[in-house]
């Protein structure tokens, strides 16, 4: 166990939109510390979003993340030799990071096109409450609902 709680890092906002959420997305897309490539991918995806939806890409992205954020998740808890999947509420910082992770994973899972196109498509899908990231959220909620009987084991 830790001696004390790890302090949250302050992430500086991204240079183009001046938004912390976009900076977090860039960090999630980034591989091997190649931030400029990640920025090109994200900003390219935002350009595609602007073309396809004719709306502000930042608003579309924010709404997409809001739609993907999970409210509940299950955590394993051992009680007397049996492991139960206990539904718990997700804290706000974790909600955001899960949403971003699921959007990026869903985009990476698609094959055969440039990453910026896949990312733009996934963000637009999440904005419209469809797509793989939304499915992941619904599956998580379904698991929590199915294990509702064990909610009294929360800690």
Swiss-Prot record:
InterPro entries: Ribosomal_uS7 (IPR000235), Ribosomal_uS7_bac/org-type (IPR005717), Ribosomal_uS7_CS (IPR020606), Ribosomal_uS7_dom (IPR023798), Ribosomal_uS7_dom_sf (IPR036823)
The keyword Transit peptide appears for this protein: no
Annotated GO biological process: ribosomal small subunit assembly; translation
Keyword Transmembrane carried by entry: no
UniProt keyword terms in alphabetical order: Ribonucleoprotein, Ribosomal protein, RNA-binding, rRNA-binding, tRNA-binding
GO cellular component: cytosolic small ribosomal subunit; ribosome
One Pfam family in the UniProt entry: Ribosomal_S7
GO terms, molecular function: mRNA binding; rRNA binding; structural constituent of ribosome; tRNA binding
Subunit structure, interactors included: Part of the 30S ribosomal subunit. Contacts proteins S9 and S11.
NCBIfam families noted in UniProt: rpsG_bact (TIGR01029)
Family to which the UniProt record says this protein belongs: Belongs to the universal ribosomal protein uS7 family.
Task of the protein: One of the primary rRNA binding proteins, it binds directly to 16S rRNA where it nucleates assembly of the head domain of the 30S subunit. Is located at the subunit interface close to the decoding center, probably blocks exit of the E-site tRNA.
Protein name: Small ribosomal subunit protein uS7
Organism of provenance: Thermotoga maritima (strain ATCC 43589 / DSM 3109 / JCM 10099 / NBRC 100826 / MSB8)
Gene: rpsG
């Amino acid at each position: 166990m830790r001696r004390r709680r790890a302090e949250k890092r302050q992430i500086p906002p991204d240079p183009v939109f001046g938004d912390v959420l976009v900076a977090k997305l860039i960090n999630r897309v980034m591989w091997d510390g190649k931030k400029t490539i990640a920025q090109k991918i994200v900003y390219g995806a935002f350009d595609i979003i602007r073309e396809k939806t004719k709306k502000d890409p930042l608003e579309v992205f924010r709404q997409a993340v809001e739609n993907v954020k999970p409210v509940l998740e299950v955590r394993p808890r051992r009680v007397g030799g049996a492991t139960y999947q206990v539904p718990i509420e997700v804290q706000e910082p974790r909600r955001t990071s899960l949403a971003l992770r699921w959007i990026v994973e869903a985009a990476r899972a698609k094959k055969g096109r440039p990453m910026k196109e896949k990312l733009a498509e996934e963000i637009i899908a999440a904005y419209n409450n469809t797509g793989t990231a939304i499915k992941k959220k619904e599956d998580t909620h379904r698991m929590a609902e199915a294990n509702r009987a064990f909610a009294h084991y929360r800690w």
